[in-house]
Amino acid sequence: MAAQRARAPAMRTRGGDAALCAPEDGWVKVHPTPGTMLFREILLGQMGYTEGQGVYNVVRSSEAATRQLQAAIFHALLNATTYRDLEEDWRRHVVARGLQPQRLVRRYRNAREGDIAGVAERVFDTWRCTLRTTLLDFAHGVVDCFAPGGPSGPTSFPKYIDWLTCLGLVPILRKTREGEATQRLGAFLRQHTLPRQLATVAGAAERAGPGLLDLAVAFDSTRMAEYDRVHIYYNHRRGEWLVRDPVSGQRGECLVLCPPLWTGDRLVFDSPVQRLCPEIVACHALREHAHICRLRNTASVKVLLGRKSDSERGVAGAARVVNKALGEDDETKAGSAASRLVRLIINMKGMRHVGDINDTVRAYLDEAGGHLIDTPAVDHTLPGFGKGGTGRGSRPQDPGARPQQLRQAFQTAVVNNINGMLEGYINNLFGTIERLRETNAGLATQLQARDRELRRAQAGALEREQRAADRAAGGGAGRPAEADLLRADYDIIDVSKSMDDDTYVANSFQHQYIPAYGQDLERLSRLWEHELVRCFKILRHRNKQGQETSISYSSGAIASFVAPYFEYVLRAPRAGALITGSDVILGEEELWEAVFKKTRLQTYLTDVAALFVADVQHAALPRPPSPTPADFRASASPRGGSRSRTRTRSRSPGRTPRGAPDQGWGVERRDGRPHARR
């Protein structure tokens, strides 16, 4: 997407300047245009949002700029301290707590020399930690003065990144003034109590104060233009940029970090959104097409057919299904009465002649005869079984012949009864079948006629609706491809000719065709992530298992984007040394510790601590015996200079003469204050 040529009207500032720019001079309006406004909409998620686009939340985070500002203020304050101020604060602390070397030695005179030195080191470490914490609180208050407006303020770092991501340039409006940041910083330095209590803080505030005030003025005097209320013009002949606020009429300057390309009639920006815009628009169009298909596309109607195999159709297949359901297949061969009765019914259904009844029933009775007539369960001696009684005069018969005759008689009676019943039933069925066949033939003829009429009516109605739709769309000859598509949506699929007696419709449904765009979304997500990570030099942090834990600015990103923000956008007088990528993820106290170790104050504290421990160790040494008059006469010289030198060397540096009062830490000066030993 590129900025199209637009007519730049002649504009005047509120001060009554001459014509700002004219079309004949080669000025072209490059923002706002439909293309540049689309960039901002894309960045806000109006064209969709993907997982890879979430990296931009880290890119526009102000964490790196905040850490750079904190490091600059910490460096300015700590490097503004002097050895004299630090020594004075330490001397006051020693006198206030009575920690002079002589007093420490007298207090711990029974301790070993190493223990006394350890006490001295501990005493100084306590004061050093207290001083460091006090200075951190003071520096934290100074940093708070530079955060007016928060993330949405006029000089916010996220707004700076938004401009670079969309256009690769930043329009800046400047007006020198003392605003909220300057007023807050001045009031803080005047009203804080620490400068009146510690010489170190007072000296640091006095020396670093002017530079900090200049930095605050730079924050107050700079305002980055809002994306939707600024006009940007470009003159290719002169290579100049012009920025103007259409509401206030204020003119500004344009910081071009990534120079665009002028193609003769348009400007192609060098920015991440410019490079991703074609892919984003194409993917968005595909999603819109899928949504339209979801709403209006009704083709195609699909019919699912199911057909049995030849071995599973007919009576044999039904018998096999029944056998399997009742457990009467070849594998099980169960002998339940229900299965035998069902098999009898199925065999009777499969009979082709009336004479088959006798064979079917006899087969059933042979299979179930032993169960229907159980010989032990029937008493043949009872009345009703012929001459089976055991009365006198009766001749005993063969025991096996009687049950066999009974079974034959039972089978004959059953077959005769079934034959008589079925003959009458079959005769009635034959008559009914003939009557239904005649009726069915007439109904089939009528149904075919009605079906033909219905098809003709549907075809005519569909053609009329299609013609009406074509006329409403501007004529049928204008867009033949779309007309064919609309007709295809109403195609009727006839599957009646593909079906026979053994075929049935198992399911039918209407399927909406929706184009798949999942792969396009995944590709766009990877493009977003790749472009943002590579363009802004984002650093990934991983654990030992290779899993990503966080992402942050690298040292290259700080040099490429954070440094120009302070140097060219804010025009900060003292931005200090650039932080590294590892410093970005540090907390405020951790950053303070890292900066503290690199400043001169750390060196001063190390030196003062070494001198204090040395004085304590020197005071703990045993004192030499007092010299006698003979010693003085033996070592005296004719001029008396040797006596003076011997007397001077008998005293240790930093120790008072024997019997003299302890004046504090070091040698007494003329004004009564002790000299600090260096």
Curated annotation (Swiss-Prot):
It holds the Pfam family Herpes_UL6. GO terms for cellular component: host cell nucleus; virion component. The keyword Isomerase does not apply. Belongs to the herpesviridae portal protein family. It is found in: Virion; Host nucleus. GO terms for biological process: chromosome organization. It comes from the Viruses. Homododecamerizes. Interacts with terminase subunits TRM1 and TRM3. This is Portal protein. Residues 459-470, 667-678 have a biased composition (Basic and acidic residues). HAMAP family: HSV_PORTL. Residues 422-443 are annotated as: Putative leucine zipper motif. Residues 376-405, 459-480, 622-678 are annotated as: Disordered. Keywords: Disulfide bond, Host nucleus, Viral genome packaging, Viral release from host cell, Virion. Residues 642-652 have a biased composition (Basic residues).
